[in-house]
């Protein structure tokens, strides 16, 4: 597969006989929602050196063992396969002892195994998983299946470890890292705008930047597979950074190992805070220093921190879909096998529909960028209907046309909420993106009488007032829903924790809207009379506004019980366009609309979102 992610849409179009849309439709035929094969992970092969006498000279033997499905107490190792500038390339000094008693030389570089074994021994970890040794690389089928589900190993491990190779060579570099990780370089400002500020001089900030830049130049930050490995470990990843033995270890260092051991999540969070603080006040005067700061931010960004403070550096992606950011960051890195990028993206984004590389090749699809675009769309990611023509690459198109007007109903777990916001049951056709859901129209404005401050402090009281008002508005089913919710009873269609969380957040948003004196709208399914939905008066919502909603349980697709895909949920204000074929409504996305609605499966209908102009050109 060709790595054409740097080619423009125009170039992609001119190099093929068929249109981009017809290519996307053809790629769709190579998609599958069947569950991934986890048989090779049921008993996970790991390496253990615990049976070796610690007084024995030389390197220990490594025993290939098997862990049960429930065992999570192992280290999952993330490292660069290829040669690195700062490491000895020798391997084979370690012996791997198989279950049969036969032995073979280890393929992983000796220096990597030296550091890993010393680290896990210091932490009391009995075994570790490393792909080059624990997956049969000669078995193409096993390797392919493992590739599609590699994320599960890193999610499962309690002790994921990233092995970097560029060493710290000066004491002040370690000192800078200590101050960074303890939050001594930048801090949050508790004002109504939500800002960060720098706590050190410009000259000290420049020294810290050089330390961060050195760490970011490690090849560990350049691989697509490693992006997945770190991303899927969530908050558990520890980084091993080599350092000169003469450097004095500080509080952040483990005295039992030669490496500097730091928390990857904390490092990203503090590095992002520091870089935003520096960029926002133009700390660095030289063009090179400003480039280095942006370079660090691109490679070590914290998505949560960037969402909170990105406005300070003119980052416009606050309400951009998470998958768009993830895809852009993956494509900044490299992969020796370009088609691996499809599995990496699917694993990181929790996609239920995957593309079969062999089928793509058989269908004559060679374009990685169009395969990524198809994967993005067929998994329900929302595109804006825009007449704006994109002259850039496929990634530029996704950034430009990806829906960016999400409005999460609560302050907590906003990125998780946005990650669930996807369309359901996608089918691509010449006219556009076909999906299923419910079409509502706002028919009645209701505003509850003002409540006392004591009443507003009690959410239960507010819910009771809402339920009473719904009863007087001929919305009996909604009234019953809110009364049941007060008793802890959720609607039956919420069969998964993900959708229950969404419902809780939406009810909370309605309660807060009532407390704030906002209008709320009762909505009816188009063609029906009874109000079955409430939406909050936000943005441009008015009487007569059309709202499209849909949901899909993660367990509506065939999959293994240990790795759930994400529930899908959308609630969008749309424009309905007149079309000759009235049986299939044509909708155009406008805004997000928070609210609660009661679906009836019999009323779900197919709709079509037309292709953006850039793809139709």
What does each model-identified segment do?
Residues 1-127, 134-145, 152, 157, ...:
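Metal-dependent phosphate/diphosphate-handling catalytic cores characterized by acidic Asp/Glu clusters
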Residues 4, 12-19, 149, 173, ...:
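Non-membrane alpha-helical secondary structure
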Residues 56-64, 113-114, 145-148, 211-213, ...:
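Short alpha-helical segments and helix-capping/turn motifs at coil-helix boundaries
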Residues 80, 128, 219-220, 224, ...:
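Residues in intrinsically disordered, low-complexity segments of regulatory proteins
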Residues 100-106, 142-150, 155-358:
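Metal-ion-coordinating, acidic/His-rich active-site neighborhoods
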Residues 254, 261-262, 266-484:
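Short helix/strand-capping turn motifs
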Residues 418-419, 424-617:
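Long mid-to-C-terminal assembly/interaction modules of large eukaryotic proteins
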């Amino acid at each position: 597969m060709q790595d054409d992610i740097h080619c423009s849409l125009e170039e992609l179009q001119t190099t093929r006989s068929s249109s981009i849309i017809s290519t996307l439709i053809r790629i769709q035929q190579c998609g599958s929602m069947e569950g991934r094969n986890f048989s090779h992970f049921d008993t996970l092969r790991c390496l253990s050196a615990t049976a070796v006498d610690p007084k024995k000279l030389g390197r220990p033997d490594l025993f290939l063992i098997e862990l049960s499905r429930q065992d999570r107490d192992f280290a999952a190792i993330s490292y660069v396969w290829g040669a690195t500038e700062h490491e000895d390339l020798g391997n084979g000094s370690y012996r791997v002892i198989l279950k049969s008693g036969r032995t073979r030389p280890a393929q992983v570089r000796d220096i990597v195994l030296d550091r890993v074994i010393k680290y896990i021994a210091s932490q009391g970890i009995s075994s570790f998983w490393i792909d080059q040794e624990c997956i049969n690389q000669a078995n193409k089928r096993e390797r392919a299946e493992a590739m599609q589900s590699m994320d599960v190993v890193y999610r499962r491990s309690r002790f994921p470890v990233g092995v970097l190779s560029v060493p710290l060579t000066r004491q002040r570099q370690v000192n800078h890292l200590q101050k960074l990780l303890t939050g001594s370089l930048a801090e949050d400002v508790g004002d109504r705008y939500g800002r960060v500020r720098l706590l050190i001089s410009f000259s000290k900030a420049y020294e810290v930047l050089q330390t961060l830049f050195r760490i970011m130049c490690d090849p560990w930050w350049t691989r697509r597979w490693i992006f997945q490995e770190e991303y899927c470990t969530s908050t558990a990843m520890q980084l091993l950074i080599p350092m000169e033995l003469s450097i004095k270890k500080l509080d952040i260092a483990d005295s039992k190992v030669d490496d500097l051991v730091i928390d990857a999540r904390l490092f990203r969070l503090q590095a992002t805070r520091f870089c935003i603080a520096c960029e926002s006040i133009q700390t660095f005067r030289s063009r090179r220093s400003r480039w280095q700061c942006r370079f660090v931010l691109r490679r070590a960004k914290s998505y949560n921190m960037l969402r909170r403070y990105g406005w300070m550096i003119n980052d416009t992606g606050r309400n951009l879909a998470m998958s768009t950011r993830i895809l852009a960051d993956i494509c900044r890195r490299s992969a020796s096998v370009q088609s691996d990028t499809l599995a990496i993206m699917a694993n990181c984004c929790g996609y239920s529909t995957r593309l079969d590389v062999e089928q793509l090749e058989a269908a004559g699809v060679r374009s990685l960028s169009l395969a990524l675009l198809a994967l993005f769309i067929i998994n329900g990611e929302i595109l804006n209907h825009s007449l704006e023509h994109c002259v850039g690459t496929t990634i530029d198109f996704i950034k430009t046309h990806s829906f960016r007007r999400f409005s999460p109903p609560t302050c907590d777990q906003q990125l998780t909420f946005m990650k669930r916001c996807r369309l359901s049951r996608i089918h691509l056709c010449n006219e556009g993106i076909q999906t299923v859901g419910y079409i509502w129209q706002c028919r009645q404005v209701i505003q509850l009488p003002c409540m006392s401050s004591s009443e507003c402090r009690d959410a239960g009281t507010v819910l009771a007032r809402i339920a009473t008002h719904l009863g007087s508005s001929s919305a009996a089913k909604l009234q019953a829903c809110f009364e049941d919710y007060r008793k802890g009873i959720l609607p039956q269609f919420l069969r998964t924790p993900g959708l229950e969380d969404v419902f809780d957040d939406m009810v909370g948003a309605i309660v807060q809207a009532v407390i704030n004196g906002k209008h709320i709208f009762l909505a009816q399914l188009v063609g029906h009379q009874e109000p079955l939905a409430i939406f909050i008066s936000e943005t441009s919502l008015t009487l007569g506004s059309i709202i499209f909603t849909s949901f899909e349980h993660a367990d509506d697709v065939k999959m293994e019980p240990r790795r759930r895909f994400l529930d899908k949920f959308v609630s969008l204000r749309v424009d309905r366009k007149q079309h000759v074929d009235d049986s299939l409504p044509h909708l155009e996305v406008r805004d997000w609309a928070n609210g609660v609605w009661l679906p009836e499966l019999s009323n779900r209908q197919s709709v079509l979102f037309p292709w953006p102009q850039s793809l139709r050109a």
